[in-house]
């Protein structure tokens, strides 16, 4: 089974991102806009209960926080992904680190750069054009975050929520 761990932003932020993703992201229909805390990983069905228990522990050790989303960035030249930048708060960093230590040992493919993908799989020319236009626009959103989600991938490639974890002591 393939799992991933994400934060979903508010509907307003998702709507803004989806307005762009419809045109620039071939994964638009597979998963809603999100901030990845742990990239997708394979696991056995019998490990799911232990994973859920560990995520409850991590959530209880993390205080709710404010998510700041703004500006447009890119991972070029590594890859042609365009994204909304997400401010790296201590809480986001803690969540990401906890999901790559101890129970969740897994090699990182990239350093943690919190972001909300709005375009990917673009040609070099299209990437440069879209990025140039979006960088001229003013984007800034903030919202309180009090939960994260464990997702699993269905056979058709779409992702769905398995469980939601509320941040802070006494919420799980």
Swiss-Prot record:
Q: Please provide the record's keywords in A-Z order.
A: Hydrolase
The record, for InterPro entries, names: 2H_phosphoesterase_YjcG-like, Cyclic_Pdiesterase, YjcG
Question: Which Cys residues form disulphide pairs?
Answer: none
Q: Is the Hydrolase keyword given for this protein?
A: yes
Please give one Pfam family short name: 2_5_RNA_ligase2
Residue interval(s) of motif HXTX 2: 115-118
* Catalytic activity, EC: 3.1.-.-
Name the active site residues. Answer: 34 (proton donor), 115 (proton acceptor)
One MF annotation (Gene Ontology) recorded for this entry: hydrolase activity, acting on ester bonds
For this entry, the protein name equals Putative phosphoesterase BCAH820_1309
Q: Which organism does this record belong to?
A: Bacillus cereus (strain AH820)
């Amino acid at each position: 089974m393939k799992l991933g761990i994400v934060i979903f932003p508010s509907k307003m932020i998702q709507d803004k991102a989806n307005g762009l993703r419809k045109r620039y992201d071939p994964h638009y229909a597979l998963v809603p806009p999100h901030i990845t805390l742990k990239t997708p990983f394979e696991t056995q069905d019998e490990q799911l209960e232990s994973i859920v228990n560990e995520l409850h522990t991590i959530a209880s050790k993390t205080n709710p926080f404010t998510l700041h989303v703004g500006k447009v960035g890119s991972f070029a030249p590594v890859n042609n992904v365009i994204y909304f930048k997400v401010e790296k708060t201590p809480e986001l960093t803690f969540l990401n680190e906890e999901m790559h230590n101890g129970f969740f040992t897994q090699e990182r493919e990239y350093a943690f750069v919190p972001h909300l993908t709005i375009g990917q799989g673009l040609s070099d020319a299209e990437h440069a054009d879209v990025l140039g236009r979006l960088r001229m626009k003013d984007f800034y959103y903030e919202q309180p975050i009090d939960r994260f989600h464990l997702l699993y991938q269905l056979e058709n490639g779409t992702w769905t929520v398995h469980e939601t974890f509320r941040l802070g002591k006494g919420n799980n």
